[in-house]
Every structure is written in structure tokens, then in C-alpha cells.
UniProtKB/Swiss-Prot annotation:
Role of this protein: Involved in the de novo purine biosynthesis. Catalyzes the transfer of formate to 5-phospho-ribosyl-glycinamide (GAR), producing 5-phospho-ribosyl-N-formylglycinamide (FGAR). Formate is provided by PurU via hydrolysis of 10-formyl-tetrahydrofolate.
NCBIfam families per the UniProt record, alphabetical: PRK09288.1, purT
UniProt keyword list: ATP-binding, Ligase, Magnesium, Metal-binding, Nucleotide-binding, Purine biosynthesis
Residue span(s) of domain ATP-grasp: 125-320
Family in the record: Belongs to the PurK/PurT family.
PANTHER family per the UniProt record, alphabetical: FORMATE-DEPENDENT PHOSPHORIBOSYLGLYCINAMIDE FORMYLTRANSFERASE (PTHR43055:SF1)
UniProt record, GO biological process: 'de novo' IMP biosynthetic process
Top EC group: ligase
Gene: purT
EC numbers: 6.3.1.21
Residue positions binding ATP: 120, 162, 167-172, 202-205, 210
Organism: Bordetella parapertussis (strain 12822 / ATCC BAA-587 / NCTC 13253)
Name the UniProt record assigns to this protein: Formate-dependent phosphoribosylglycinamide formyltransferase
Quaternary structure (record): Homodimer.
Cellular component annotations (GO), alphabetically ordered: cytosol
Length: 406
């Protein structure tokens, strides 16, 4: 096993500074910035739009098209970070691989992990074909006709279609019959992160529930890399986007063990240091791999209130080579606060009411612009059990009202 010298952290804005650059400064990136700031790290946040949540708390902020390799290289060379942390998928990952190969920068967890997980084809082929992990049956297709042939050739109905590059459920839909194919194809072409293109069609698995298993690769006190697991997180999605999550989700011992084995296999192959959000389907004691994100996961926002160290603190500590603590503090839940209006500079009402109940908290992300279904915040709650925590978190999010500013 590899060894590693004890980490030394510097002073921000000084010659000794430990510099970390985040590529992506949304609500998840913002929490990573805060976690790094608490450890005395100098943080540079990059996003495609001004005043992103992470921009508001970083030492320096840049507005850059992160899919433009020339622009991305320029900002990295300008800031000279010790570590680059991809916080979204829409990045010129070929450049990150090249820079890491050159020894110019360290990418967390690795540039290869960022590259493979930026589209569903890379990670599905790794999981199913290289590692032999159980997945839903799938095919990759480039035309509507090829989609029809894939479904008729064995995928069957119902099935799920997704762009190979998309996030938050964009472009994703269920095809229940041949009558749905044309509309589903158009929706997938509109929802892809880089426009029209390749899609994945997956056979439907009759699962009981799906979980996110936050998996952390970090160095122990002896410097060796060890893999640790948070308690499983259950979540509910609408149109492919998470609306609530809770921890822990009850599982059979056999299903939990199999989930950990799958997560260990895929994160071990991706390598590096940091947290991974491993998404799994579960039916009884059977477990199937779904997806993995080599970064904090949106469903993991429940850990802001449920764990000793939340997922953002775990990621920050791990990428710096520090030991981590994945223990659950108390059963908890999160519930999304949606914008509900289309406006800039919105105001939030009902915050005092939302926080009046003991064991609750909120995060307001500070996004400069609201849309009807844009996540603008999250309600958080802990309780004696998950069901009580879910009910409390829902009351928190429902109490907060978003209105257009004056």
C-alpha cells in the first residue's frame, strides 16, 4: 500500500497557503468551500455564471466556461492550485487528465474518475464490462431508429432513456410503449448537457428502493488509504431530481454488505482521495449498481444535520490527506426548498417559522436567480427515527416561501 507524508496546511493569502480550486460553485461546492475554509485552505471557486453560491464564500472567484479547455487551462495556470476539485460533470476532463499526467496539478479524486463519470457510457462500461458488477441491461444508441431497435431487440418495455451527459434528471424519461419513443427521443436530445447526441436506454429493474452510499477514500492516521462508508441514504425523486432524502435507510444485512462490496469495487478502481456518491438499486437482498459521482452528492445534504462530519467536511478532509469520521449522529432528513417563482434577487419568508421546531435547520443557497423548479435551499431535521425526521424536514421546507424581490 502507498504511504504519504503527514499533511502540512498553510495560511491563506500567504506564501505558505494550501490552494484548492473548485470547478463548479453551486450549493454543493459552496459547502465544500466552507469546509475547506475552516481548515485554513485558500479556496478559488470557478463557475460558468457570476455570483454562484460558492463564489460568495471563496477567497477568489472566476467566471469561466469550464467546457472550454483553453479557458480552463488559463485559469488553472493563473491560480496555480495545489489541488483541483471537480464539483460538476460539465468540465473539459480531457484537459484535467493531461494536466495530471504532466504533473501540473492533482485532481481529486483523480482526473480519470472525473473523465469516466462525466458521461454514463464511461462509467457503465467500467462497472458492467470491466468490473462485472450487476447493472440494469443497457444499450447506447445514436438515432431514434437505433433506439427502437434496441428496445425491440431485448431491452423491452418499460425502459428508461437518458442522455449520456446530463444531470438532475434533465432529458430523462420512461418509455412504456412504442407510442412514447418519439417524444422521449426528442426530450433526451433537448436535455443533454452538450446538446443533441448519444443516449443510454436501460431496461427497467423492479427494485424496492434506491440508495446513495457515500463512500470515502481517505488516509488513516498511519497514512494508508482506507475506504469507509456512511450509513445508507434513502431518497425520493420526481422527474429524476431529488426532492427529499433521509438517513439511515433500513436495509437487510445482506443487502448492506453487497452494497458496500459494489461501492468498494467501483471506487477502488477510480482511485484517489475523496468522497463518492454511489447510487444503487435494491430489491430484497439483491443490489444493482446505478451510477457514481466522484464528489459530494445532492441527496447527501441530509448529512449536514445527521452525521458527526457531513459529506462536505469528509470530502475536504479526505482530499487534504486527513483522517475522517463517517459516524451517524442521529437519524435525519432533508427536504428541498424550490424557487417557485422566476426572478432575480428573491427574498425568503417564513424562515423563523421554519426554524421554530427543535431539531431543525435550513440552508439557503444564495443563488442569484430563481426558477420555478430550481433548488434554492433545503430544510433539515433530526428526530428519534427517520419517519419523524422526514415529516419535520417537510414542514421546514414548506414553511419557507420564496418571493420576488422588491
Amino acid at each position: 500500500m502507498s504511504t504519504f507524508p503527514a499533511p502540512v496546511l498553510g495560511t491563506p493569502l500567504s506564501p505558505t497557503a494550501t490552494r484548492v480550486m473548485l470547478l463548479g460553485a453551486g450549493e454543493l461546492g459552496k459547502e465544500v468551500v466552507i469546509a475547506l475554509q475552516r481548515l485554513g485552505v485558500e479556496v478559488i471557486a470557478v463557475d460558468r455564471y457570476a455570483d454562484a453560491p460558492g463564489h460568495q464564500v471563496a477567497h477568489r472567484a472566476h467566471v469561466v466556461s469550464m467546457t472550454d479547455p483553453q479557458a480552463l487551462r488559463q485559469v488553472i495556470e493563473q491560480e496555480r492550485p495545489h489541488v483541483v476539485v471537480p464539483e460538476i460533470e460539465a468540465i473539459a476532463t480531457d484537459l484535467l487528465v493531461a494536466l495530471e499526467d504532466e504533473g501540473a496539478v492533482r485532481v481529486t479524486p483523480t482526473a480519470r474518475a472525473a473523465h469516466l463519470t462525466m458521461n454514463r457510457e464511461g462509467i457503465h462500461r467500467l462497472a458492467a464490462e470491466t468490473l462485472g458488477l450487476p447493472t440494469s441491461p443497457y444499450r447506447f444508441v445514436d438515432t431514434e431508429q437505433a433506439l427502437r431497435e434496441a428496445i425491440d431487440g431485448g431491452i423491452g418495455y418499460p425502459c428508461v432513456i437518458k442522455p449520456v451527459m446530463s444531470s438532475s434528471g434533465k432529458g430523462q424519461s420512461i418509455i412504456r410503449s412504442a407510442d412514447d419513443i418519439a417524444a422521449a427521443w426528442r426530450y433526451a436530445q433537448e436535455g443533454g448537457r452538450v446538446g443533441a447526441g448519444r443516449v443510454i436506454v436501460e431496461g427497467f429493474i423492479e427494485f424496492d428502493y434506491e440508495i446513495t452510499l457515500l463512500t470515502v477514500r481517505a488516509r488513516g492516521a498511519d497514512g494508508q488509504i482506507v475506504t469507509q462508508f456512511c450509513e445508507p441514504i434513502g431518497h425520493r425523486q420526481v422527474d429524476g431530481d431529488y426532492v427529499e432524502s433521509w438517513q439511515p435507510h433500513p436495509m437487510s444485512p445482506a443487502a448492506l454488505q453487497r452494497s458496500r462490496e459494489i461501492a468498494l469495487a467501483v471506487t477502488g478502481d477510480l482511485g484517489g482521495l475523496g468522497i463518492f456518491g454511489v447510487e444503487l438499486f435494491v430489491a430484497g437482498d439483491q443490489v444493482w449498481f446505478s451510477e457514481v459521482s466522484p464528489r459530494p452528492h445532492d441527496t447527501g445534504m441530509v448529512t449536514l444535520i445527521s452525521q458527526v462530519q457531513n459529506e462536505f467536511e469528509l470530502h475536504a478532509r479526505a482530499l487534504l490527506g486527513l483522517p475522517v469520521d463517517t459516524r451517524l449522529r442521529q437519524p435525519g432528513a432533508s427536504s428541498v426548498i424550490y424557487g417557485g417563482v422566476e426572478a432575480r434577487g428573491v427574498a425568503f419568508e417564513g424562515v423563523a417559522q421554519a426554524l421554530a421546531e427543535p431539531g431543525t435547520d435550513i440552508r439557503l443557497f444564495g443563488k442569484p436567480e430563481s426558477f420555478a423548479k430550481r433548488r434554492m435551499g433545503v430544510g433539515l431535521a433530526v428526530a428519534d427515527d427517520v419517519d419523524q425526521a422526514r415529516a419535520k424536514a417537510a414542514r421546514v421546507s414548506q414553511a419557507v416561501r420564496v418571493r420576488a424581490g422588491a
